[in-house]
Amino acid sequence: MLPLTWDQLYEACNSCQGCELAKTRTNCVFGTGNKEADILFVGEAPGEQEDLTGTPFVGRAGQLLDKYLYAVDIAREDVYIANILKCRPPKNRDPLPAEEDACIDYLREQVRLIKPKIIVCLGRIAAMRLIKPDFKISKEHGTWFEKGNFVMTAVYHPAALLRDPRRKEEMLADMQQIKKKLDSLKDNV
């Protein structure tokens, strides 16, 4: 994929027919937020509400993410939120490798255009794709990794916390560390 502008990338994503998911999507869920964000949050794929609205993390999981952002004094307007997949898999199943491969260049271009200081993977699927293939979310959440020009970490996916609320304190601690890392990176500029 050639380097694109925001508008070109958005149009390319909206017209994408790179995998079977394009046939069943209501909307391409490109991403939302500050295009100059210091933090990029990356989930795995849109859910039903996201497919209907074309905006990531607007359902119950997104509302929970908003609460965590608020709790650590990070405004949603100051971050960018995207997914690895831009189209919803049927019945919210895990993305297939071929689907990830079809979409990953869109995310790479988003990263290139945003130039975030921190990339936060929301859940194991995003972490396995972006940090390392054998990533174990239960053991490695909140751990920092350096990849290229970015520092990266992963937290539990908000949807997982809705299913298992026992992890909510760990999520809050991870989000506090993200805020602390962001503040330290801003201080070093």
Please report, for each region that a protein language model flagged, where it lies by residue.
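A polyanion-binding, active-site-adjacent surface
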Residues: M1-V189
